[in-house]
């Protein structure tokens, strides 16, 4: 799952992801080729295909999917399970902190981690847009995030 606060940022990210999938399908001699007969839209790609079993049309295949979500409201990052949830352009997302906290439920089932949350992108904004990323960065353990300290951090 790839999320961004606005559709422009999400679409630019998804264009790159879809380009990478096309490359894998076209240039890896079939090694990474996955059919996308059932879902192949600008916001969702699912590796599945239709087959007939006893005359019934059924979906089959890997069933893995990549979905893009405009998460301008934290409630849009709910109700699913995911192995990876990416918060693109996290430094430009005024609802990042609440979305990140709610996103934890997508990768955790009964206290067992089944996936990870990733936040990345711009840190160049200021004010409310940057507050969530700043909070997570300076107190990573509270949000189950691996801390990153560079040589310029005093503590």
Where are these regions (language model features)?
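Conserved nucleotide-state-sensing and coupling region of NTP-binding domains
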Residues: 2-72
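Walker B catalytic acidic pair
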Residues: 86-92
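SF2 helicase motor core recognition
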Residues: 74-81
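Conserved P-loop NTPase catalytic core
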Residues: 55-56, 63-67, 81-85, 98, ...
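Short, conserved "post-DEAD/DEAH" coupling segment immediately C-terminal to helicase motif II
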Residues: 95-115, 120
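A generic structural motif
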Residues: 28-48, 113-121, 144-154
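Residues immediately C-terminal
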Residues: 73, 92-93
């Amino acid at each position: 799952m790839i999320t961004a606060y606005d559709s422009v940022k999400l679409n630019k990210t998804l264009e790159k992801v879809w380009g990478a999938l096309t490359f894998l399908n076209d240039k890896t001699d079939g090694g990474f080729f996955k059919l996308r007969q059932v879902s192949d839209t600008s916001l969702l790609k699912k590796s599945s295909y239709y087959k007939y079993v006893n005359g019934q049309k059924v979906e089959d295949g890997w069933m893995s999917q990549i979905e893009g979500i405009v998460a301008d409201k934290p409630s849009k990052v709910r109700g699913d399970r995911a192995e990876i949830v990416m918060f693109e352009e996290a430094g430009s997302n005024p609802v990042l902190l609440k979305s990140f906290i709610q996103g934890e439920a997508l990768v955790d089932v009964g206290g067992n981690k089944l996936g990870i949350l990733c936040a990345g992108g711009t840190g160049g904004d200021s004010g409310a847009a940057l507050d969530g990323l700043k909070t997570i960065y300076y107190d990573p353990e509270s949000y189950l995030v691996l801390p990153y300290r560079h040589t310029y951090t005093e503590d």
